[in-house]
Amino acid sequence: MLRWALIFFIIAIIAAVFGFGGIATAAAGIAKVLFYLFLVVAVVMLVSALLAGRNLTR
């Protein structure tokens, strides 16, 4: 159990370094772009599946 506590402590330290170091701002920008990109892809796939008349869940 102590091993897991140390692992999560190290992960928390690494996350703090990234969060307070300014890298989080760049990552958030990239995440927003990817979110909207995949949202558009999902909508296009949904519309194309509906127009083709196929079952959405294979």
Curated annotation (Swiss-Prot):
Residues forming coiled coils: none
Transmembrane regions listed in the UniProt entry: 4-24, 33-53
The record's section on InterPro entries has: DUF1328
State if Transmembrane is listed as a keyword. yes
Q: How does it sit in the membrane?
A: Multi-pass membrane protein
Provide GO CC annotations from the record: plasma membrane
Q: Where in the cell is it found?
A: Cell membrane
Q: Give one Pfam family, short name only.
A: DUF1328
The record's keywords, sorted A to Z, are: Cell membrane, Membrane, Transmembrane, Transmembrane helix
The family line of this record is:
Belongs to the UPF0391 family.
Protein name as catalogued: UPF0391 membrane protein GM21_0108
Classification of source organism? Bacteria, Pseudomonadati, Thermodesulfobacteriota, Desulfuromonadia, Geobacterales
